Structure formats: structure tokens, C-alpha cells
């Protein structure tokens, strides 16, 4: 377990979320933009780039390793509690996915959300805000 204070306190964090680890769109399109641009994003003053999905921590760790995402903090929102608290749930029950997260990205400065993009939330769209 990791607390939100551990992630956000005293830091500038770019947190992005995807509906699910290992899903085609997230794996082929969304995550790679952040992996490729991690150095550029950090050069603009971001301390931590975090990727979150409503998956368990083990799945997120395996997905991060499979995608060479060593520069990213891979976070599992196992029960979707954080996602629900943000009001950014996606109902994927019709596709057999259960409750998931919408695709979004936010900039958080010392625990305060300064920008929130919900589709589009690509690395390019977030870099334009830095």
C-alpha cells in the first residue's frame, strides 16, 4: 500500500490513468507516449510520472516491466476506490471488464490538482501544459 501523501506531498506529479493494463489501446497508444517522453516531461519540472489503472499492483508491475516503463511509477487502484473518489469511473461491465477508470491525466502540485484532462490525456496534451 502507498498513500496519496507519499505520492503527491511536496512534489509535482503527472498522474495518468487508463482503463486497464495490457489492453490494446492502453498498451499500443497511451502508455508508450509517456514512456518515450518521460525525460522531456521530467525536464519540465515533473518529479514523478505515475500510471494508474483499476488493476492490482502485481499486474501493474508486470505491465510496466513488459513496456520498459522504468521511469514511471505504476499504481494499481485495486478496488477502484481512488478512481471513484475522483468521480472518474468507467462502467465496463458490458464488456466483462467491471468498473474501471476513464482515461485521464492530471497535474498535481503538492497535493493540489492544477490541471485535469479527461480524453484527451496523451503525453503530448499534458506536455503542452507544462
Explain the meaning of each model-derived region.
Residues 1-130:
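Chalcogenol-based redox active-site neighborhoods
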Amino acid at each position: 500500500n502507498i498513500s496519496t501523501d507519499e505520492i503527491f506531498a511536496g512534489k509535482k506529479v503527472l498522474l495518468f490513468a487508463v482503463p486497464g493494463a495490457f489492453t490494446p489501446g492502453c498498451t499500443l497508444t497511451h502508455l508508450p507516449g509517456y514512456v518515450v517522453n518521460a525525460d522531456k516531461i521530467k525536464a519540465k519540472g515533473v518529479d514523478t510520472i505515475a500510471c494508474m489503472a483499476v488493476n492490482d499492483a502485481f499486474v501493474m508491475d508486470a505491465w510496466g516491466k513488459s513496456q520498459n516503463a522504468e521511469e514511471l511509477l505504476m499504481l494499481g487502484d485495486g478496488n477502484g476506490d481512488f478512481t471513484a473518489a475522483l468521480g472518474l469511473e468507467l462502467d465496463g461491465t458490458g464488456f466483462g471488464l467491471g468498473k474501471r477508470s476513464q482515461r485521464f491525466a492530471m497535474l498535481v502540485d503538492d497535493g493540489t490538482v492544477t490541471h485535469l484532462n479527461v480524453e484527451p490525456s496523451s503525453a503530448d496534451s499534458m506536455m503542452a501544459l507544462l
